[in-house]
């Protein structure tokens, strides 16, 4: 059983290191998405900054406490000493601890009490000019994001293998080549990626959407073929753009769905900034609101790889896993058990005959001569 008191003490020991890391983000350049095709409205610039730091600055041992609705409102970045990826249980414990810690601070400030500790004063500075009720709302909007620098670097390396062929496919469909970067947002260019929601492959198609563009059966899955799935992604993105008329909306639709994005566009006159700020459609949550900013951040890092990952020039391109789209049918439990018993009896009979013919009888572990 985990000792909660010990864990809390351990977290307090990390506090000074955490405060030192806060604000160490390294992106101050021009947003890559300020081209005509991929505009970056002022409303989402802070979100793009946030995701650049997540992808290229903060490691898997950095935990960023922030506001879900205003991701640029960062309360703390806690660095976990050590090396390697934290275990799942440890990461979940840290998230729970940090969420509770800042919920307590925000709820205390919501009572109208004057900030009395260093951390309370630091949090209060983020709410200058706002009423105490803003603290209460913020307490319900806490989120902890783990850094992804190591994962993103691995994705950059894998992208070297796939990028040329993917770019050719996208150009064939009349798509801007920068859209290939979405594969990094989706899966880190990992062809065998699987999500908890059942999405599969580099482009993370669900079974339902995938069947509209690929062959997916009980024993065959084209989502595991990077070439086939890339063509499907290109067709979907082309269709999204033709239906919605802008890349911010078309890219959002890749995550949220075309129908839902069309509804949001109709409600707000196609204004992406208003949609992100005000649309309350079903399941239009954190992931969908941040999908286009994540894409712009990924483009920024890809286009400035030498700046964010200067050691990459010396790294070798990894060989991708072999493509396997066909699966042998699985026997039912009853049939498998029957087959096992039948095979076991047949082999036992064969051994008995062989033993009799050679003059040996097997009894337990010993072999006795007649």
Where on the chain are the PLM-derived regions?
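An acidic, Gly/Ser/Thr/Pro-rich helix-cap/linker signature
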Residues: 29-171, 339, 348-349
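Short, surface-exposed glycine/acidic/tryptophan-bearing loops
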Residues: 137, 193-213
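Bacterial N-terminal signal peptides that target proteins for export
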Residues: 3-15
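Bacterial N-terminal signal peptides
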Residues: 15-25
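Extracytoplasmic and endomembrane cell-envelope/extracellular-matrix remodeling and assembly machinery
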Residues: 118-121, 125-155, 160-161, 173, ...
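Alpha-helical scaffolds flanking conserved acidic
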Residues: 99, 176-183, 200, 247-252
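A generic alpha-helix surface/boundary motif
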Residues: 163-164, 183, 204, 208, ...
């Amino acid at each position: 059983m985990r000792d909660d008191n010990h864990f809390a003490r351990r977290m307090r020991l990390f506090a000074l290191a955490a405060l030192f890391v806060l604000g160490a983000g390294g992106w101050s350049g021009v947003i890559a998405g300020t081209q005509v095709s991929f505009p970056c409205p002022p409303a989402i610039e802070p979100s793009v900054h946030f995701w650049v730091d997540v992808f290229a600055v903060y490691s898997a041992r950095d935990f960023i406490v922030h506001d879900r609705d205003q991701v640029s409102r960062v309360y703390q970045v806690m660095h976990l000493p050590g090396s390697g990826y934290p275990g799942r249980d440890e990461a979940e414990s840290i998230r729970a601890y940090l969420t509770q810690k800042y919920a307590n601070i925000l709820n205390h400030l919501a009572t109208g009490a004057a900030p009395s500790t260093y951390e309370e004063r630091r949090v209060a500075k983020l709410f200058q000019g706002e009423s105490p009720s803003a603290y209460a709302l913020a307490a319900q909007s806490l989120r902890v994001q783990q850094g992804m620098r190591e994962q993103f670097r691995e994705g950059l390396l894998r992208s070297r293998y796939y990028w040329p062929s993917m770019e050719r496919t996208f150009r064939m469909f009349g798509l801007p080549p920068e859209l290939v970067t979405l594969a990094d947002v989706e899966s880190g260019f990992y062809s065998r990626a699987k999500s908890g929601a059942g999405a599969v492959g580099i482009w993370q198609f669900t079974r339902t959407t995938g069947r509209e563009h690929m062959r997916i059966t009980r024993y065959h899955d084209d989502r595991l073929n990077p070439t086939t799935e890339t063509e499907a992604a290109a067709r979907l993105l082309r269709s999204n753009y033709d239906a919605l008329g802008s890349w911010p909306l078309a890219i959002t639709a890749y995550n949220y769905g075309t129908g839902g994005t069309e509804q949001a566009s109709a409600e707000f006159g196609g204004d992406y900034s208003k949609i992100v700020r005000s649309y309350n459609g079903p399941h239009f949550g954190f992931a969908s609101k941040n999908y286009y900013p994540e894409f712009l951040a990924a483009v920024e890092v890809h286009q400035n790889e030498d700046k964010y990952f200067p050691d990459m020039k010396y790294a070798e391109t990894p060989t991708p896993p072999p493509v396997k789209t066909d699966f042998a049918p699985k026997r039912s439990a009853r049939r498998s058990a029957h087959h096992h018993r039948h095979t076991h009896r047949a082999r036992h009979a064969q051994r008995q005959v062989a033993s009799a013919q050679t003059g040996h009888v097997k009894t337990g572990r010993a072999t006795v001569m007649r």
